[in-house]
């Protein structure tokens, strides 16, 4: 391995002898973007292969008993993979990236270039109610960190490549390059200079281009706003109300996640954690099938105005046309999603909080719209409130209003909702910040055993 590294380094020096440092960083940003795009593609292929093979044959008009079993299998497989093959903690991907930047000279173990893909896809494919973004971000960051290590870059440039990898991976999964850049600047807090932003832009654009080449041009959460979904001035009070509700849901999201994590930490046996987590998750998914996996199908149904699809594979399928049942189902699913997510991670699954925050936000926005339409006979767009709610809860949970605004703007193929996005995201951020000034990532950083030993 040492000889191989020396050979790579000599070839790198020979090829870049006539290039300046900034040119070298731009070249390496392209390399990181390509690798991050490929890693994201492999993750999605593995995830959708597992998920499709397990549940595509389920009848839509009834619940299936395998919903009780699949999540526990996924968690135990991920736990065994981590314990006996990886032998390192690969959960809480974004938190680990922040920790590596602050305390490990931006060094991330090489195995994270692939282990997060396997662990995350296994957990989510079998029904773990977590998001793929954290494993993907950790994978991209690991690629950037290890490219920097192989090139023998200093701490500053290695950190820049780490951030390029993280942003590129996020840009690739959503096909949203601006979101990848803003995510790094806002959450990873990379210094804003021309020397740092340009490689970051290059990596994000390269990874997004790879995603277009491998998966087509449609975003993972593609939605096109119709004329009836357009923002109107009379809706401003409703978006203010939505911002307050999203702020409260953000606080519920973070506090419940921490409480569930503390509960599982008191369980002394990993076997018992798996048993409890698998049982809780299986029961919740059996009753509320939209909780299965990352939940993209759930809020895609809401974004396309087809709330009845949430009842597919459900015990309540025959009630899907009753308005008040739909509203209660959406609200209950919204609250139980947080418990399902926290139980998955705490029991040993590998996944993140990014997609769950979008899920909870989508269901929060849809709940407000459905309630307004049902009780006041208003013609409120469920689609626009679903999208804006996603930005609201994400803004509060991650303390990242800009990332949430640009993500939803890119996903909706335009900026027609920019004003309500700004209103709701900022109010949600303010409400949640008043209740808890820390983001979910810094909260997890504070509560990790490793960080407590550093204090």
Task: Show where each model-derived region lies.
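Alpha-helical transmembrane segments and immediately membrane-proximal extracytoplasmic
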Residues: 1-448, 455
């Amino acid at each position: 391995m040492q000889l191989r590294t020396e050979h790579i380094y000599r070839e790198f020096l020979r090829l870049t002898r006539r290039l300046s440092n900034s040119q070298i960083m731009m070249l390496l940003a392209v390399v990181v973007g390509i690798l991050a795009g490929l890693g994201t593609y492999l993750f999605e292929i593995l995830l959708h292969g597992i998920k499709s093979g397990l549940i595509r044959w389920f009848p839509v008009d009834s619940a299936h008993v395998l919903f009780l079993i699949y999540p526990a299998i996924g968690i135990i497989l991920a736990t065994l993979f981590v314990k006996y093959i990886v032998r390192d903690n690969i959960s809480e991907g974004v938190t680990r990236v922040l920790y590596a930047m602050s305390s490990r000279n931006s060094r991330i173990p090489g195995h994270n270039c692939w282990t997060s893909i396997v662990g995350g896809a296994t957990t989510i494919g079998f029904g773990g109610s977590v998001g793929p973004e954290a494993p993907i971000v950790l994978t991209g960051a690991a690629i950037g960190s290890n490219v920097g290590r192989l090139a023998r870059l200093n701490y500053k440039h290695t950190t820049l490549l780490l951030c390029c990898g993280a942003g590129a991976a996020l840009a690739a999964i959503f096909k949203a390059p601006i979101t990848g850049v803003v995510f790094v600047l806002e959450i990873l807090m990379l210094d804003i200079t021309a020397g740092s932003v340009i490689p970051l832009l290059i990596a994000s654009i390269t990874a997004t281009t790879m995603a277009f080449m491998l998966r087509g041009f449609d975003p993972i959460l593609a939605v096109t706003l119709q004329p009836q979904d357009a923002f109107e001035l009379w809706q401003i009070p409703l978006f203010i109300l939505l911002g307050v509700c999203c702020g409260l849901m953000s606080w519920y999201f973070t506090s419940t996640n921490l409480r569930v994590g503390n509960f599982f930490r008191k369980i002394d046996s990993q076997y018992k954690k798996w048993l409890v987590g698998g049982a809780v998750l299986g029961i919740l998914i059996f009753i509320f099938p939209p909780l299965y996996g990352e939940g993209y199908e759930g809020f895609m149904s809401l974004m396309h105005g087809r709330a009845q699809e949430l009842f597919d594979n459900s015990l309540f399928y025959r009630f899907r046309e009753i308005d008040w049942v739909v509203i209660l189902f959406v609200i209950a699913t919204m609250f139980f999603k947080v418990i399902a997510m926290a139980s998955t991670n705490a029991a040993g699954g590998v996944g993140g909080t990014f997609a769950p925050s979008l899920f909870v936000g989508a269901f929060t926005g849809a709940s407000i719209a459905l309630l307004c339409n049902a009780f006041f006979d208003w013609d409120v767009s469920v689609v626009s409130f679903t999208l804006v709610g996603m930005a609201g809860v994400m803004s509060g949970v991650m303390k990242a209003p800009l990332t949430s605004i640009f993500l939803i703007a890119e996903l909706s193929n335009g900026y027609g909702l920019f004003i309500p996005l700004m209103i709701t995201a900022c109010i949600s951020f303010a409400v949640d910040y008043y209740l808890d000034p820390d983001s979910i990532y810094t909260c997890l950083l504070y509560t990790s055993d490793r960080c407590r030993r550093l204090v």
